Amino acid sequence: MRQVAIYGKGGIGKSTTTQNLTSGLHAMGKTIMVVGCDPKADSTRLLLGGLAQKSVLDTLREEGEDVELDSILKEGYGGIRCVESGGPEPGVGCAGRGIITSINMLEQLGAYTDDLDYVFYDVLGDVVCGGFAMPIREGKAQEIYIVASGEMMALYAANNISKGIQKYAKSGGVRLGGIICNSRKVANEYELLDAFAKELGSQLIHFVPRSPMVTKAEINKQTVIEFDPTCEQAEEYRELARKVDANELFVIPKPMTQERLEEILMEYGLMDL
């Protein structure tokens, strides 16, 4: 079983990328569980046909400790198992704790079955606080992919996430598997992301082009592969799935200093000299 965490700044398209990637892996015959670790609880919406899944934390709040697995785990597209850890009530408590509670509960209830090929954790990545780092800190996820684009804030976040990975890689076995570019059609985007990934000692594992097909599929509450398996964008996600499945380059990243990051941004025209 490969346990994979997908990180990236809010709004970058982590959840969309994760759900489309897992659909691609399902097309390869893989058995998958997706654990949403974002308080927004939208990590499994497309796999479940738009159903807002009841989160682990909401279920615990309403039903107490005596929870059955089928009340928090739902099967979605292609039998992909879906869980949302959810978040605390606004203004109360720590969302990161919710992730810890959820993963512990899934373990107790026997969700990590032997037939699983992959478990994906879709994690909010703007804040690399202790709770959100939990899937890597506790050694749950062994490999991490960071979703980024050619925008400055996406790269700042990716660099910060790399610092978190570096910190926990020494104690646990977690490694960076690569950067996934979710294109924003920025000038020199491919070249910038490729240089950024290499600077970290990693790779740009796939460049996902921007496509109106993604929005169309989302409006229909489906992944692109379910909505139109023959379109070019579906093939992009299948290619991403193949690359992740075949990936063997797992590194402890070498995060950049602020100065070095800004140099790279200047080099590719994102920052003015």
UniProtKB/Swiss-Prot annotation:
The reversible ADP-ribosylation of Arg-97 inactivates the nitrogenase reductase and regulates nitrogenase activity. Keywords: 4Fe-4S, ADP-ribosylation, ATP-binding, Iron, Iron-sulfur, Metal-binding, Nitrogen fixation, Nucleotide-binding, Oxidoreductase. Its cofactor is [4Fe-4S] cluster. Pfam families: Fer4_NifH (PF00142). The modification ADP-ribosylarginine is found at R97. Belongs to the NifH/BchL/ChlL family. Homodimer. The key enzymatic reactions in nitrogen fixation are catalyzed by the nitrogenase complex, which has 2 components: the iron protein and the molybdenum-iron protein. This is Nitrogenase iron protein 5. It comes from Clostridium pasteurianum. The gene is nifH5.
